[in-house]
Amino acid sequence: MKRIIAFLICAAVLISTAAVCSFALSDEKIDGEVARTTETVREGVTCTHISLGSKSKFKLQEMWIVEFDPRDPLFDLQVTCGGKYTTKLATVENTVRNFKEANKDKGLVPVVAINGDIWTTSYAHARIEGSGTEYGGFSDPVVTHEMTLPRGLDIYNGEIVSSPHTLNETPYERQLHAFGITADGRTVLGTPSLKIYLNDLSIDGFEQVKLSGLNRLPAQNTIMIYSDKVGEDTAALDDAYEIVIDCDYDYVIKDGATIKGKVTAICKKGDENPKLQQNRLIVTARGSKNIQKVKNIGIGDDVEVSFEISGSKKDGDIWSQVTNCVGGHTILVKNGKAVANNDSDVIPATAIGNTADGHVMFLVCDGRRKDYSVGLKISDMPELCKKLGFENCFLVDGGGSSTLLKTTGEDTYEIVNVPSDKFDDGTYGRPRTVVNSIILSFIDENLLATPEPEPTAPEETQPAPAATSDQSGNKKGCGSSLTESPALCVTFAVAFAAALPSLIKRKKNTSE
């Protein structure tokens, strides 16, 4: 018996040690590598700094790679914005601080964060009426005021806040990609789409209308729908035909959702733009053919809007289970193979992806400084990311937006890299405001709000308490195996050792 107990203790310790120390970042030297250091940000999270010399095929670079296992039940990975609305820009640090304050009762303590999706700007796609802006050969106005939107499919803690950039949001450069994660820590990289349909339940034989997108620019020849997460109004031009739908409950837009409401107003050309508010949706049609499709819908009608995420057949149904998702630029590695591109732009870069064993890695590389770090040529990134150990990886965003933030204490953070934007005195490192951030948090169960116990009959035997979960569905304090949580492995080993005397004593009083 003693031998069995000793064996189990050793096994538990070995498992916990393996879980703590097993990381997937390749230790193979990169061409021209002159220095590499790794620090543990907290148990289960490493940050590796790699320096490449000027003779490297990838040029002079300073880069950082963060690695962790998203399946660890004590970790939580979310995509979020810095304010109440998705149109609010904020620095990564301010977003992290706002996130921590909003989630303190859930025990979420941010550990590291990076910048997220690319977004629409007033000097490009979101051309403001009367500004005279021209971009990519297009000069037609799109909005009445500034409208900053993520350009990819973005999901914040289970709620879809934007569908991907559409063909009519001019100019349409390319199909955008997205990286998603499920509640149990599985990841997916692909090119998902969001199908949206509007149906009028008050009209017999009404032919449901396929909508162009969710929380996108109110572009010409589209039918967009806007949720209460996007801002105070749709910023649509005067020629838009808008249908206001009010719901009598707190709706959440997610895959498979059908949201029902009542039409409370219709705003035509010459009318004032309707206002968005909690539990309200607004359908905005532009172009005569599109307006005709929704013109029979009247005030007082009961309507419903359905949402469905779809990816490629190879992805299966995983996109329907994604709880957090960020859009972005270019796929660099897919299923272990570097994906070649001919983009010669050289930029500071932020990338995200997964390793073959399911870990997630962030990559942030500085740039735009010939004496420090020049930045990565996008066409070189597939080879580099493959060498670093990515199984799947894509370029989220770059330029002055590239930011890596990590915790340095209970409520202190530091920017690890040196962003390429300058302060007023000309020095580099000024953090840029971005449309959203990707935040890895540690779940501190000591900070969880304690619910009031429900009264129970004294004669009933109560079942063992189930493992709790946060809003994104990530389990806390349980896992499918010991290796999923280093903390649990250590706890198991310590508890087992503490119980040894009683186990041995009990053994003496029982038969073989």
Q: Which residues make up each language-model segment?
A:
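Juxtamembrane/start-of-transmembrane alpha-helix segments at the extracytoplasmic/lumenal side
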Residues: 479-491
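Zymogen propeptides
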Residues: 24-284
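Sec-dependent signal peptide cleavage junction
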Residues: 17-28, 475-481
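Conserved, well-ordered active-site substructure
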Residues: 123-173, 322-391, 400-449
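C-terminal low-complexity, Ser/Thr- and acidic/Pro-rich disordered "stalk" regions positioned immediately N-terminal
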Residues: 445-481
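Loop/turn positions that initiate beta-strands
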Residues: 297-305
